[in-house]
Regions:
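Generic structural signal for well-ordered alpha-helices
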Residues: 51-55, 81, 164, 239
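Surface-exposed cleft-lining segments at the edges of enzyme active sites
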Residues: 139-156, 215-227
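CE4/NodB-like, metal-dependent polysaccharide N-deacetylase domain
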Residues: 54-63, 87, 160-175
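The conserved 3'-phosphoadenosine-5'-phosphosulfate
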Residues: 100, 165-241, 247-248
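Acidic, metal-coordinating catalytic cores used for nucleic-acid/nucleotide bond scission
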Residues: 72-76, 156-157, 183-187
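Structural motif corresponding to alpha-helix initiation and N-cap regions
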Residues: 48-51, 77-78, 161, 225, ...
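Generic recognition of short, well-ordered alpha-helical segments
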Residues: 21, 79-82, 162, 189-190
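PAPS-dependent sulfotransferase catalytic core
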Residues: 1-77, 86-133, 141-149
Length: 250
C-alpha cells in the first residue's frame, strides 16, 4: 500500500492575522504545493474523515514539492496539537500573531459581515464566555463541531499565551516559527527569507508585490475609544506574556 502524501508544514493561525496573504505568498514558490481550498480543516472539522481524505487534497503534488495546509482554526482548536503530533510529528508549524485588540475587532466585524453575529460589539464580547461553555467536550469527538467556538471566540482567540504552550509542549522549538502579522505586511522581503529558510526551500528572491487579501473597510475607526481601551485592559496579560516570553510587542 503506497504511503499517503501528507503536509510537510502547517499554517496554524491566527484567524484575521494574514494567513490568506501567507497562503498566496507561499503558493508562488515553485517548490510549494498548497490546495486551492486554503483551509482544509482536517484536524478541526473533518478529523473523522481519516487520513486518506486528507491526502486526497495533495494528489496533484509534483515530485520535489513540499506541501502544506494553512487553516487558522488549528491554533485555537483544543484537540489540534495532539492530533497533528500523532499524524505529522515532524511537520513545520507556522504561526502569525496580530495585535490582540486589532485581531479581536477584526473577527467581530468579519462575523457581522457574514451574518454570523447579530449582537453589537459590546454585547457580543459580553456573551462570549456563555457561548463557548462546553465547547471543549464537544470538540473532543472526532466529528465534534461547535459553532460559537469557531465564530464567536473574539477575546479567546486573542489570548495567545493560553494557546501556544500546548503546541510547545508537543513540538520542539525548531519546528515552530512564530511571526508578527504586522511584519508580514511592513517587511515582506525579510519574512519571505525566514519562511524559505524555515521550510527548507531553495531561496527565491521576493518579487516585491504583496498580495492584497481581505482588506478592511475602515470599520475599526468606528470603534468607541472606551471599548478599545477596555479590550486592551482585558488582554493586558497577553501583551505582557508575548513581550516577555516571545519578544513580540504591539
Amino acid at each position: 500500500m503506497p504511503r499517503l502524501r501528507l503536509p510537510d508544514f502547517l499554517g496554524l493561525g491566527v484567524q484575521k492575522g494574514g494567513t490568506t496573504t501567507l497562503h498566496q505568498m507561499l503558493a508562488e514558490h515553485p517548490e510549494v504545493f498548497l490546495p486551492e481550498q486554503k483551509e482544509v480543516h482536517y484536524f478541526s472539522l473533518h478529523y473523522a474523515e481519516g487520513p486518506a481524505w486528507y491526502a486526497a487534497h495533495y494528489e496533484a503534488l509534483a515530485p520535489g514539492q513540499r506541501c502544506g495546509d494553512i487553516t487558522p482554526y488549528y491554533l485555537f482548536h483544543p484537540e489540534a496539537p495532539a492530533r497533528i503530533k500523532a499524524l505529522l510529528p515532524t511537520a513545520r508549524l507556522l504561526v502569525l500573531l496580530r495585535d490582540p485588540v486589532q485581531r479581536t475587532l477584526s473577527q467581530l466585524f468579519h462575523s457581522r459581515r457574514l451574518g454570523l453575529e447579530p449582537l453589537d460589539l459590546e454585547a457580543a464580547i459580553a456573551a462570549e464566555s456563555q457561548r463557548l461553555a462546553g465547547a471543549e467536550a464537544v470538540l473532543a469527538r472526532p466529528d465534534g463541531r461547535h459553532g460559537s467556538h469557531q465564530e464567536h471566540s473574539y477575546l479567546s482567540r486573542s489570548r495567545y499565551e493560553r494557546q501556544l504552550p500546548g503546541w510547545q509542549a508537543l513540538f520542539p522549538p525548531e519546528q515552530l516559527l512564530i511571526l508578527r502579522s504586522e511584519d508580514l505586511f511592513t517587511d515582506p522581503a525579510s519574512i519571505w527569507q525566514r519562511l524559505q529558510s524555515f521550510l527548507g526551500l531553495t531561496p527565491v528572491p521576493w518579487a516585491g508585490e504583496l498580495p492584497r487579501a481581505n482588506a478592511g473597510s475602515g470599520e475599526q475607526a468606528t470603534v468607541p475609544p472606551q471599548l478599545r481601551a477596555w479590550l486592551r485592559e482585558q488582554l493586558a496579560p497577553t501583551y505582557r506574556a508575548m513581550e516577555a516570553g516571545y519578544g513580540l510587542g504591539w
